[in-house]
Structure formats: structure tokens, C-alpha cells
Amino acid sequence: MLIKTIFIIFLMFFSVNVFSKNVWIIENIQFKGLKYFSKDEVLKNIFFNIGSNISENDIKHSIKSLFQTGKFETIKIVHSGKTIIFEIKERPIISNITFSGNKIIKDSILKKYLTELGIKEGNFFNPFLNTVFVKNLKEFYSNVGRYNSDIKIFKKISSNNKIDLQIFIHESNLVEINHIKIIGNNHFPRDKILSLFKLKDCKSWWNFLEKRFYYSQQLEEDLKNLSNFYLNQGYYYFNIHRKKVRFLKDKNKVNITVYISEGKKYKISNFFLNGNLLQYYQSIKNFINIHNNEFYNKEKITLIVKKIQRFLSEKGYIDPKIIIYPQINFKEKKIILNFNIDIQKRYFVNKINFRGNELTQDIVLRREMKQIEGEWFNLKLIELGIKSLEKLKFLSDITVQKEILFNKENGVDITYTLKEQPTGTLNFGLGYGRDSGLSFNASISQDNLFGSGNSLKASIIKNDNQKYADISIMHPYFIDDGTNLDTRIFYNDFKYNINSFYNIVKTTSGFESDLSFLINAFNRVNIGFGYTHNGLLNKEEKFFSKNGNKSSDKFLKTSLVDDFTLNYSLTHDTLKYFYFPISGNQTYISGKNTIPGSDNKFYKFLFDSEQYIPLEEEKKFIFLTHIRAGIGNSLNKEKLPFYENFHAIDSNNIRGFRANTIGPKKIYINSNLEECLGYNKKSIFCESVDSIGGNAMIISNLELITPIPLIKTEYSKFLRSSFFLDAGNIWDTRWDKEQNIHFSQFPDYTILNNIQASIGISLQWFSPIGPLVFSYAYPIYKNKNNQLEAFQFNFGKNW
């Protein structure tokens, strides 16, 4: 068969020769030049097979399909008789990719981006993708202020059609701002305008180390802030005509010139509310707090629109349209605002779904919902659902999405997406102490037991001085309305032994059970009952009480004490996140007192409040205030039982002081005086190392929580640092050292006297085994007998 026509197809810079014929039958297909791309893969990308009737269009489409694979450099097709021959030149295979010169971006980040583009080892080399990579990388460097950066890619092709890519990156220096000039400002001085900019052309006196670098994106943000400033002052026709950025000859400095037109100030003479607003007309009108002859304020009007949208979203109107149409009186410089509102459809919630809860049962999440299925959509209730879920310790990263249903009129589905946190801890400890000997402890806790939302905690301690065990369980929805039941059973056999002066063996067992009632989303009331059986045995009488009367605690020699207590508390909680809160308040007020049938008669009250105040919009810098105050006393002439005293341990401690060494001490007389604190040869008295606690307490913490330098954003969820000031003490309000002149050498624990304080830094890590807290403190107020401990480590929630 004669060759009638030869046609050439150019696609990009490739050519194809084909002898044309309208339609003919192919009996053979041959391929030349294939090395890494198989014949079968080519056949999958062409539009004909052996025996097919083909046309010129079939060949054109086949060539286009093959080029779209990105694996061929040239494709030439020759038609000879009933044979089609593909003469193909493959693109080289990428063998190796190396980088040099990159300091800002790691090799791994660059390789990841190249892989996303399709440029990786083992892939065919595509020059177009290289161009895209260079363009985008230069754009990135420009966005971070490296405007003169350069990227070059050198290619080395081997004989086996493989290619090595060597990417050389020149990261230019940051460009310093030489001068910022504002032209057209008649009503506000340059200094006032530049105070709105984050870009600066001069250093602040208080921060002489700061740099004045130019970033194009920051300039756009600054100009937007400038525009908003004028619009909020009434300059309705304020305009930024243009900006001019001129690089100086050395290209390391830049001059910025901004041309503005301020215009005249406009007042609002009136406003009108238009639209089918049904029964909401008056409520919406009340949001528009604009007075006649008030200067135009864009920020205020934007806030009004947001309030109206929020109001309607709580009534079921998901997407109301609010358009403000101004009528301008140029002569009088006045504006009439027309609020044109279309509330559109009203939606009901069809179904609430949860995504991400692999362990947690659906009912556990659903009972936290404030929005009810089948009722009108209410954005406020949906957001309260997020806050309720955030208060569960075992959940994080909670978001919500809505999906409008097209198959159900006015219906919308709500989906909460969440991430489950580790819910259980199992700890074992082994230690040795001079007095306690070998010590073993173990604990287990589960905040989401079998996905039920219930909490279970148990712990044991065993050493020469103590045998301790307790178990507690909390059912957060004991009654469907959100009533919690918390029950704890405990046993403690402890020998108080201080420097061989005395031993007290105290055996305690009992239980506590509380019911917690939900008042609203942020407040809860607890009321409960407790029973404690105390067995006290005094083995030594060589000690004095704090008022100096010898053996005044003789009743401890053999004593069985049963206490029945009424427990009550009020909790207010608006914290954003349980661990690492960023805003809000948590206040806990509790009390307990004995009831008839108890061997003791006493009361105790505790006030615990912490407030997190974000100092900037991103909530990276947070000011924390925390105060714990307590008071307790006997209801008769007796003292508060010593085992009910407040102690400086755990969250009560002042950092920098050893735990349980702050506050009243026991005072002794003994021949072995060197073992006591405060010993001097002129006195036969000394005090114990550890505190016996007191009936009054005030501990306050002031902290500035700051981001940790050089820590990536994703790690900031698990790490937090702060600078702190701790102050306070433990007191005994019945302490009176004037009763005995020999006690003058010891600190006075009268209320509000003898304050202890420290300053320092702290680091908290939310580790896989729970929160770990490290602190380093320096005491600024102390007494000579204080036991100091600069570096401290704690396990548990701190702030």
C-alpha cells in the first residue's frame, strides 16, 4: 500500500510524521526507544489496538494521551503499510536529588514539597514541574523577606538515561526598611499613622535590638489597618491611591512611600431597617445602637451586623443576608444607612453525628449536647456543646460542621469531629527513705472507663511508716439531668515519726460520697456525706504542744475517733481547655463540718480560684492569677484535729520551698538537740523539720505564661512555660508564743504574719503518662529555718 501523506504534529516542541489516510486497518504496532516504560503501559494510553480501524484523529489523541503521562520527551509515529511504528524518546529517570545553601528550609521539607509536585527519585524528569518548583520557592522566600534569593537547578544526565538534580539555593539577606513616607495625611501626624504599622523604620527606645525588616505581606496588613483607622474616624471616602516600594542600590534597604487621600468626615443622619423580619424586627432594631449625627464608624457597623447575624443564627436562620446600602448627602456630609436584611430559610437540626470517637460511646458525647435533634438550629447551643466536650479530659481538637440537607426541606445535620486523648495511666514507684525504709507505690486511673465516661482511680502505698489504699469512682451522669455521683473508699495506716522525738500511729478508714448538681453550663453544686474512723496511738510522750503545755495531747495515747461530715461545694468553670487553659475562670468554694454523732466538732472552708487572661489575640501570652485560701476551727474550745490541718504540699506549696516545711512546727524538749531546727545553746527547745500544718492558709500565684522560643506550633499544645511569683503561708490562729518566753526564737504563726514568697520559672509538659511540671525558684521572703529546694518536679495538673 502506497504512502499517501506524511503529517507532522508539534506538541510542545515534539514532532510526529504520519502518512495520512482517512481510515485504515492496523495489523502491527511497534515501539522503538522504550527502556523504563513498558510496551503494555503504552498500549493502555493509546486509542487503538491491532485489527482496529484507525484515523488521523486516533493517532493525534493517542499522542496527546502519551504526552499527558509526563514520561516522554519526543514521540514520532511512522505509518508504513499496515504497521504503526512509535519512535519514542523517554524522559530521564530522576536518580538523585541534593540540596545546598538552604538554611531556612530543611532538606526534608524541600523533598516533601518536590514529592507533592511529582519530582522524586524514580520518577521521570519533567522540566515544567522544575519551573513550578523554582517559581513557588522564590515566592516563599519573598514572603519571608528574602527578596533577592536565587534558585538554580543543575542537571547531570548519565549514559543510562538517568539524571541527578543538584539544587543550589542562595538565601538572600533580609531587606531593612530605610524610611517610610506618608503623603496626603492632613488630619493625623506621621507618628500617629506609623504607630498603626508593625513595620518600622526606626527602633523603639525600649527594644534597641529589634530589626526593621520589610515584608510585603505585613505591609498589606498595615495598609489595611490604616484604612480601617480612618474609616472608624468617619472618613468614609478615605483611599490609599498607591504604594511605592523602592529598593536602594545595594538591594539590602528599601524606601516605602504610601499615597493617601483622607477626604472629609461623614456623619450618620439616620438608619432604616428593611426586610421581612417577622417578630424579630424590634429585637434587631435594638442592636443598631447608632445615634443621629454620630460619625461613621466601620468597626461599629461591622459589629452590629455580626450581632444581628448571631441573633438570627440562634433562632434557626443559618445564613441571613445583610446588605448595608448607604445614601450619601455630599453637600451636608451625611449618610443614611439602609440595613436590608433577608433572613432566608429557617432550619431545624435533623441529626447530630460524632466523628473520631473510637473508644468513647456515643451516649457519652450525646449527653453533653445542648442542641436537641428536631428543634430549631441554635448556634449558641451548638457552641456550648463544644465547650462541654472540651471539659471532658479525654477529648481534644473538637470542631463542628453543619451540612444542609437537600433531600429534607429546611433540615441540617451537625457533625462534631474530635480526637480522643489517652485516658488511662498506670504508675509504679520504688524508693528508699531513712525513716520509711523501702517504699513501694502504685496507682491506676482511667478517666473514660470502657468508653462510658466514668472515672476510676485506685492507688496503694507500702513502706515502714505507711500502708495506704484508696479507690474512687465517678459517674458523671448518675441521673440523666447531669447529676454526678462520686464515691471514694480509703484506708491509711501512718506512723508520724520526727527525729525519734515521738511516734503517732494513725489508722484511718472511711468513705465519702457526693452528688453534684448541674445548675447551668458553667456552675455546679455538690453536696455529700463522709465518714472517717480514726484510730490514734501515741507511743512517746516526749513532746510539747505549740502552746508549751507538756503532754497536752495525751488524749492521743489511745484514742478512737469517729467523724461524720457534711460536705458541700460550688464550682464555677469557664476555662477554655482542661489542660493548658488559655482563657476563663475556675472557682471552687467548698466546706465541710461535723454533724451530730461525731466525736469531734469542727468546720473547714476552702476557696480556690484561678483566672486566665489572654494578653493578645493569639493567646500565646497569658496572665494567670491563682489563689487558695482556707480556714478551719473547732466548734468548741478544742483545736482543729491535727489530721484536718492544711499543709503546704502539691498545689498548696510555694515553689522553692521543700514540700510540707512551710507553716507551724512542733516544738520539743530533748537532750538530743542537734536533731532539731532552730537549736541554740541558750534554749532547750527546738522545732520539727516538717510542718504539722495549720488551721488557716493563703497561697497565691501570679504567672506570666509565655510561648517557648524555637518550639514549633504543633508542639506548643504539649509544652508551656511561665514566670511566676508565689506567696503565702500556713498559720495557726490559736498560736500565742507570748505565753512562753522560751518560744521567742521561733517564727510567729499568727494570721497574716510571716509571709513566704519566691520567684522563678516553670515548664509543664503534657507527656504520655500525664502532666509533668518542672520549676526552678528563688525564695525572696523566708525565715532562717526554712527548708529550701530550688529545683522541683511534680506529676499532675499545675496550670
Curated annotation (Swiss-Prot):
What Pfam family is a match for this entry? Omp85
What organism, scientifically named, is this protein from?
Buchnera aphidicola subsp. Schizaphis graminum (strain Sg)
Q: In the UniProt record, does the keyword Transport occur?
A: no
Q: Tell me which residues make up the POTRA domain.
A: 24-91, 92-172, 175-263, 266-344, 347-421
PROSITE patterns, per the entry = POTRA
The identity of this protein, by name, is: Outer membrane protein assembly factor BamA
Gene for this protein? Answer: bamA
One BP term from GO: Gram-negative-bacterium-type cell outer membrane assembly
**Which HAMAP family does the record match to this protein?**
OM_assembly_BamA (MF_01430)
Transmembrane domains' residue ranges: none
- Signal peptide per UniProt: 1-20
Q: What keywords are assigned to this protein?
A: Cell outer membrane, Membrane, Repeat, Signal, Transmembrane, Transmembrane beta strand
What highest taxon heads this organism's lineage? Bacteria
As for what it does, the entry says: Part of the outer membrane protein assembly complex, which is involved in assembly and insertion of beta-barrel proteins into the outer membrane.
Q: Which GO terms describe its cellular component?
A: Bam protein complex
Q: InterPro entries per the record?
A: Bac_surfAg_D15, BamA/TamA_POTRA, D15-like, OM_assembly_BamA, POTRA
Fill in the subunit field for this protein.
Part of the Bam complex.
Hey, which family's this protein in? Belongs to the BamA family.
Subcellular location as annotated: Cell outer membrane
